[in-house]
From Swiss-Prot:
It comes from Staphylococcus aureus (strain N315). InterPro entries: ATG22/LtaA_families, MFS, MFS_dom, MFS_trans_sf. GO terms for cellular component: plasma membrane. The gene is ltaA. This is Proton-coupled antiporter flippase LtaA. The keyword Cell membrane applies. Belongs to the major facilitator superfamily. LtaA family.
Length: 396
C-alpha cells in the first residue's frame, strides 16, 4: 500500500512538472512564432515573405518530427531526445539575441523550435492515465493554450517597450524548462532498438490500423484553421468593429475553452462509451451550426456569445476525441502512435489556412470560407455518427 502511494505521488509529481515544461515551451513558441516574427517586418528590414516562410517551416518541422519522434524516443531514450530538443531550441533562440534581423536565423530558429516541442507533446499524451484521461487531457490542452496565448501577449507588450531588446526572454524561458526537466523521471511504454526498416514498416502498420481516425484528426484542424486568415477581415469589414473588440471575442473564446478544459473535461472519465460518442457528435453538429451562423451575424455581442459557446465546446470536445482515439492505441505503441496522430493533425492545421485564403480570394466572398468550414464538420458528424450508430448496434 505504501509503495503504491509513493508510486502515485511520483507519477503525479512527474505529470505536474511535465505540464509546467509544456507550458513554458509553448510560452516560448507563442512569444516567437505568434508575436516576435510577426512584428519583425514592422520594426526591422525583414520582409513579410521571410516571416511567412518561417511561420510555415515551423509547423512543417513540427508535423514532420511528430511522425517519427515516437520511434526516436524508443530507440535513443527520453534523455537524449529531450536534451537534444532543448539544446536546439535554446541555441536557436539565443542566436536571435545576436542576429535579430537575420533571415537565416529567423527561419532556422522557427524550424528548430518546431522540432524541439514535438517530443514533449508525445510524452505528455502517452503518459496520461487511462482512468483520468478526460481530466488530465483537459490540463494538457489548457497548459498548451495558456502557454501560447500568454506568451504571445507577453511578447507583444515587450515589443511595445522595445522591438528587439527583450529577445533574450525567449531563450531564458526555454532554459528554465530545460532545468526543470532534470527533476522529472520520464518513462516510456517500452524501449526497442529495431532497425530503421522495421521502424518504417511499423509506421505503415500504425497508419493502416488507424485510418478510421484520420478524417477526424486531419479535418478538424483544417476546418478551424481555414477561418484563421479571414477572421480579422470578417471582424473589421463585415461586423465593422475595432481590433480591440475582435480581440475581446478571441479572449472570450479562450476563457470559455479554459473553463471547459479545467472543469468540464473530467466529465469524460468514468462515463459510458455512448456518452463519449454523444459529446463528439454534439460537438461536430454544434460547430457546424455556430460557424454557419457566424456568416449571417453582424452584431458583435452575438459574436461574443458564439465565441464563448465555441470555446466551451472545444474544451470538452478535445478530451472526448482524445479518449476516443486512445481506445484504438496498443499499450506498447503509445509514443509512436501519438506521434503519427500529431503529425496528421499538424498537416491539417497547415492546409486549412491555405484553403481558407484561396476560397476567399477566388470567390471574393468571406462567407464561402465559413460554409466550407461548416461543411467539413457536417461531413465529420455524418461519418462518425454513422460509425457510432453501427458500433452501438454491434455492442448490443
Amino acid at each position: 500500500m505504501q509503495d503504491s502511494s509513493l508510486n502515485n505521488y511520483a507519477n503525479h509529481k512527474n505529470f505536474i512538472l511535465m505540464l509546467i515544461i509544456l507550458f513554458l515551451m509553448e510560452f516560448a513558441r507563442g512569444m516567437y512564432i505568434l508575436s516576435y516574427i510577426n512584428f519583425l517586418p514592422t520594426v526591422t528590414s525583414i520582409a513579410v515573405a521571410i516571416t511567412s516562410l518561417a511561420f510555415s517551416i515551423h509547423f512543417i518541422a513540427d508535423a514532420s518530427t511528430n511522425f517519427v519522434i515516437g520511434f526516436l524516443l524508443k530507440k535513443f531514450g527520453t534523455k537524449i531526445v529531450l536534451t537534444t530538443g532543448f539544446i536546439l531550441a535554446f541555441t536557436s533562440l539565443f542566436l536571435v539575441i545576436w542576429f535579430p534581423a537575420s533571415p537565416f536565423v529567423i527561419i532556422f530558429s522557427a524550424m528548430m523550435l518546431g522540432i524541439a516541442v514535438s517530443p514533449i507533446w508525445v510524452i505528455m499524451l502517452s503518459s496520461v492515465e487511462e482512468d483520468k484521461r478526460g481530466k488530465q487531457m483537459g490540463y494538457v490542452y489548457f497548459s498548451w493554450l495558456l502557454g501560447l496565448l500568454v506568451g504571445m501577449v507577453f511578447m507583444n507588450l515587450l515589443i511595445k517597450v522595445h522591438p528587439t531588446r527583450f529577445a533574450f526572454m525567449m531563450s531564458l524561458v526555454v532554459l528554465i524548462a530545460w532545468i526543470l526537466y532534470y527533476f522529472v523521471d520520464v518513462k516510456l511504454t517500452n524501449y526497442n532498438t529495431r532497425p530503421v526498416k522495421a521502424q518504417l514498416r511499423q509506421i505503415v502498420d500504425v497508419t493502416k490500423r488507424h485510418l478510421l481516425l484520420f478524417p477526424g484528426i486531419l479535418l478538424q484542424g483544417a476546418a478551424i484553421a481555414a477561418l484563421v486568415p479571414i477572421l480579422p477581415t470578417y471582424a473589421t469589414k463585415v461586423i465593422n468593429v475595432s481590433t480591440i473588440e475582435y480581440t475581446v471575442a478571441i479572449i472570450i473564446g479562450g476563457i470559455g475553452c479554459a473553463v471547459s478544459m479545467l472543469f468540464l473535461s473530467k466529465l469524460i472519465d468514468n462515463r459510458s462509451r455512448n456518452f463519449m460518442y454523444g459529446v463528439i457528435l454534439s460537438g461536430f453538429i454544434l460547430y457546424m451550426i455556430l460557424i454557419f451562423t457566424l456568416s449571417m451575424i453582424v452584431n458583435i455581442h452575438i459574436v461574443w456569445i458564439i465565441a464563448l459557446a465555441i470555446g466551451l465546446m472545444y474544451g470538452i470536445l478535445l478530451p472526448a476525441w482524445n479518449t476516443f482515439m486512445a481506445r484504438f492505441i496498443k499499450s506498447d505503441e503509445q509514443e509512436e502512435t501519438w506521434g503519427v496522430f500529431n503529425s496528421i493533425q499538424g498537416f491539417g492545421s497547415m492546409i486549412g489556412p491555405l484553403f481558407g485564403g484561396l476560397i476567399t480570394q477566388f470567390t471574393n466572398d468571406l462567407n464561402n470560407t465559413f460554409y466550407f468550414s461548416a461543411l467539413i464538420f457536417l461531413v465529420l458528424a455524418v461519418f462518425y455518427g454513422s460509425y457510432f450508430i453501427a458500433n452501438r448496434e454491434k455492442a448490443k
